[in-house]
Every structure is written in C-alpha cells, then in structure tokens.
C-alpha cells in the first residue's frame, strides 16, 4: 500500500511509485495527471443564508423545542392565563442555537477557503532529469519535489534527500517547534505526523535547509486534504 511509505526505504519507495530519483518524464507525468486529476482541494458549495436557516431548523433537537414551544403557547391560550414566557424562552433558545450554528458554519467555510488558497501555489520538480517550476496543481504521485529554505510543501512526499532540513508543521500538528527531517529514517511502528521524520506534508513550510521527496499523495488524498474534507462536510 502506497500509504505505508513511512516504513519503506528509499529504493523501495522509488520502485513502488514507478519513478526514479531523477523524476518522471514529461509524458508519464501528463498521463498520471489525466488519470488521477489535479493536485487541488475540492471546492465546497456555498449554501444561501435561507438554506442555512432552514437546515438549522430541521435539526431534531430544534424540532423538539419548537413542538414544546407550540404546546406551551397552546396551553397558555387554552387556559387563558396569558403566560407566554415559557414559549418565548424556548423560541429564544431556538434562535440563539440557529445563529450559533450558522456562525460556526461560516467559520468552517472561511477555513476551507484558506486551505483552497494552497491550490494556487507553484512547485519545483525534477522532470526529464531537469529542475523546473510548475503549477502545484500539476503535481502527480511519483514526481520528485524539490524543497528549499522558505518553500511551502505542495504535496505529501517521502523524502529521498535532506540537508539540515527543518519543517514547520504547526498547520497539521499544532506544534510550533520545527521538526528536523531525515530521508534515511525508516519507521518501525505507527507514528503521529509530527514524528514521521522521513515525510513532508502539504501546507507545511521549510524553515531551514533543503531536500527532495517523492510525491506520495496529492489533493484530497493528502493529510491536509483530509482536513479540507472534514471542513467541507461541516459546511
């Protein structure tokens, strides 16, 4: 399984991804791009405010509260005691819950938009044995990604070469301290992302050194893509 590259040596990774340390040829890269699609996150559909309100009102708990409010109002009218406080309080709770739900959905949409800005990056790769700059959306699995100090990582990759490389991974791990990477590291057990020393991940930044890596996942298959998928499901 390609996802197990954490446990593979560099020659094994090269073999499994049908590539070389000198990169893919242009024709193979074009074929893989056509077969697997571009290296970008899916764009979530934005619902209208009216649809968001309707969706919040269709929540089971909200429906129960609305029924309770209706019963309270009916009782107040039927008994002619004129005490509508309980019903109004329930309606107020429903309104507050709906506003909070819509607000949280809006925050998720903004976070997803920020992630989608990563679609607009460029990347350095080795193709036909030559280093070249391409649109990051054109990256494919098996590409050799060139990473330099200050570069943003534009796809998940298994490192094959490192020189004093440190990566800032707070976007994924929440850890502010940069992680020193080692292309020769081979894991013997499952590790959290922050301890995967032979891997780099889309959306993280090189803060020192340089290196190269074989792209192992693009777009929604990356670790950052999984986050984008979760955010998209909440909008």
PLM region spans:
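Conserved cytosolic headpiece of P-type ATPases
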Residues: 3-235
